[in-house]
Each structure stands twice: as C-alpha cells, then as structure tokens.
C-alpha cells in the first residue's frame, strides 16, 4: 500500500505541475505566474524527497509543513483551471469523483506533520474549511440541474473531508467506532435524546418569540420552504463540521489529555470552542457582526451537546443526523444559511434565553450520573493506540 501511495503522490504532483504550466502558457496575463512558480518548486521538491525516501529530519519536516500549507492552493488553481476549460460531461464527473480522494496521496507523505495536534487542527481547517475542496467544487461545470446543488452547496467537499478524516485518523491509530456495537446504553436515555432532538429542532426553526409561554409551545410553519440547495447545504454542514470538530478535534484532545482527571470535560470544552470560533468566518459572507457573535456562542453550546451525545453513543452518525436536522429545518424556515441581523437586546429574548438553557442543561445532564460512566467506557474504545504516539 505504501508503495502505491508513493507513486500516486508523485504522479499527482507531476500532473499538477503540467496543468499549472499549461494554464500559465494559455493565460492572457501573468498574475498567477509567481505563485505557480513557488508551488511548482514545492511540488518538485516534495517529489524529489519522496523518490529519495528521505528520513523526516527537522529540515525535511519544516519543508513538509510548508508543503501542507501550499497543497490546497495548488489544488485550487488546478481545479479552477480545469473547471473553466472542461466541456466534456464525463470528464467533469470524473474530476468531481477524483476530488474525493485527491488528498490521500499527499496525506501519505505529510503524515508526520499531522501527528502534531496543532498541525492536525491547522491543516484540517485550512484544507477543508477555509480553502481546498469545498471552495473548488462549485467551479465544476455540472450540466444536470438535479446534481448541481451537490456541488454549489459544498456538499461534495464535505464528502472529500470525510474521506480525508477517516484516512487520517486511521493512519494515526484512532478507531472509527460507528461500525462496532455499543453496549449498556439506557433505553430511557436514548428515548430522551431522541425526543429532545425532535423538540429542539422544531423549537429552533419554528418557535414564535412572543412571550415566555408561547415561545415554548407555539410553532409557526408558514415560512417553511425547503429547496435542494438549502437541503444539501445543511447536509454539508452536518457531515463536514461533525467529522472535523467531533471526530478529528475531539478525539485528538481526548488523547492529549488521556492522563488528566478532567480529560473528557477539557476535550469537549476546547473542541467546542474551536467549533464555535470557526463560525466567525461567516462574517466574510456578509453576516451581521452581532448575529455572528450569537452564532459563535450558540455553536459552542451545541458543541457541548453534540460532543456529549457522540461520546455517550459512540456513534458519529447520531450527531451528524442531529446536526443535519437542525440545519435543514432552520435554513428552510429562514430561506438562508446565514443569520439575520441582530441587536444586543435580542440576546435576552425568550427564544434565546431558552436556547441557552436547553443546550447548557442538557449537556450537563449528559455528562453526569451513569451517562458519564458510559462515556468514560466509550472513550477507551474510540481510539486504539498504535506503537507510534499519534499526539
């Protein structure tokens, strides 16, 4: 397998260099030439080090760090050029499918970099949140209207992130526990989680923020107008954000603090804080500042909730589904994935106060009693330590 990944990595980089060279020769301006030269040098050096099978000495690791930084830029330029030039439907679909696995051979060479949790977080965010596949997929010319939302919504990028995350964490020795049975779960607790999921989803999307009583029990469904684009945007958020924050980040922090008394609480707190802060990027999409701050706080709190459910069930799909349900109904009721403008006073409306209390109290409940004991047991199974230390 390692030999195949090595030659895949080399071949992919050589193809990237050829495409960038051709793109600059065809370009009317030279604006991309400097960055293309830098990227070409980095890729050629990476190929050379891989061919020579150099040991990961400090200078080599420093170079690999810059290579990891440059990779999504290379992918973006290559895919942007191909997306604009390709007219063949079969080739466009082939390129879309290849985007799902394009990070795998690069990960093979950069795995020593990802053993550092700081690098793991930095490059996971850079590759699949700020840059990389999600921003590339919309540029592909997909002629079928029914398929187009899969790419314009960023959903295709979330699938690429899933493939990347599974390969990364398995390479580092972590287990994907979704495929294994979980024992000793309380039927009562699972029923409560299920009922809370349904009620919270409806409350979040349709609650009428009039007074303290109506806000709890009166729902308005008149604005519910789902579209394929909003649906796939919600699926993208659920799949991508849970894999990134609950699978990569949470498990990494659990391993770092495996000898700490408050291992679970610390891992949940820090991974949820990162999850919340990532939503600051919505400012770049034109979202209101106060609304974005509100979303950050909400995301941190829901991070507590989703982390506790994930660790209790041991199944990532449970929180992916919960996240998708929340976003599908919320996006379809507002007609947008962005929040409306808010004022400071809006923080203290019945709706927002209840939202805060629901998330906080449910998370505290999940992290106490017999549920906490089951979480401790599951944490021991969620990663399998290899001979090499993944931290």
State what each model feature region is.
Residues 22-30, 82-89, 93-96, 104-125, ...:
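Juxtamembrane helix-loop-helix connectors linking adjacent transmembrane helices
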Residues 43-62, 79, 103-111, 165-170, ...:
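Canonical alpha-helical transmembrane segments
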Residues 264-283:
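Small-polar-interrupted transmembrane alpha-helices in polytopic inner-membrane proteins
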Residues 8-10, 31-45, 88-102, 149-162, ...:
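Alpha-helical transmembrane segments of polytopic membrane proteins
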Residues 4-6, 16-30, 317-391:
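C-terminal membrane module of polytopic membrane proteins
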Residues 240-270, 311-315:
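Membrane-interface helix/loop boundary segments of multi-pass membrane proteins
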Residues 4-22, 39-45, 64-78, 101-102, ...:
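Alpha-helical transmembrane segments
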Residues 3, 51-59, 111-114, 171-176, ...:
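Membrane-interface capping segments at transmembrane-helix boundaries
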């Amino acid at each position: 397998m390692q030999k195949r990944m090595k030659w895949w990595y080399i071949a992919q980089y050589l193809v990237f260099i050829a495409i960038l060279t051709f793109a600059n020769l065809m370009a009317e301006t030279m604006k991309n030439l400097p960055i293309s030269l830098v990227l070409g040098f980095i890729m050629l050096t990476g190929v050379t080090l891989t061919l020579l099978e150099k040991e990961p000495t400090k200078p080599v690791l420093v170079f690999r760090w810059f290579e990891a930084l440059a990779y999504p830029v290379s992918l973006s330029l290559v895919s942007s050029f191909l997306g604009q030039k390709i007219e063949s439907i079969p080739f466009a679909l082939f390129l879309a499918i290849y985007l799902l696995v394009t990070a795998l051979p690069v990960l093979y060479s950069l795995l020593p970099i990802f053993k550092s949790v700081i690098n793991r977080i930095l490059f996971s965010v850079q590759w699949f949140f700020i840059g990389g596949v999600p921003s590339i997929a919309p540029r592909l010319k997909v002629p079928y209207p029914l398929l187009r939302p899969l790419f314009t919504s960023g959903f295709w990028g979330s699938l690429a992130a899933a493939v990347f995350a599974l390969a990364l964490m398995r390479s580092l020795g972590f287990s994907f526990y979704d495929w294994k049975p979980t024992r000793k779960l309380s039927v009562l607790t699972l029923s409560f989680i299920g009922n809370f999921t349904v009620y919270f989803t409806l409350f979040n999307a349709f609650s009428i923020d009039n007074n303290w009583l109506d806000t709890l029990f009166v729902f308005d469904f008149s604005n519910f107008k789902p579209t394929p684009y909003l649906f796939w945007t919600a699926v993208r958020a659920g799949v991508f954000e849970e894999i990134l924050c609950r699978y990569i980040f949470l498990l990494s922090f659990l391993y770092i603090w495996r000898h700490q008394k408050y291992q679970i609480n610390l891992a949940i707190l820090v991974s949820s804080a990162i999850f919340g802060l990532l939503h600051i990027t919505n400012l770049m999409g034109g979202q209101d500042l106060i609304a974005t701050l509100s979303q950050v706080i909400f995301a941190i709190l829901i991070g507590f909730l989703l982390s506790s459910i994930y660790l209790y069930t041991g199944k990532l799909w449970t929180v992916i589904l919960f996240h998708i349900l929340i976003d599908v109904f919320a996006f379809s009721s507002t007609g947008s994935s962005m929040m409306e403008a808010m004022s400071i006073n809006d923080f203290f409306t019945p709706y927002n106060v209840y939202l805060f209390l629901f998330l906080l109290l449910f998370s505290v409940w999940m992290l106490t009693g017999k549920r906490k004991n089951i979480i401790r047991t599951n944490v021991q199974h969620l990663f399998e330590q290899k001979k090499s230390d993944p931290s």
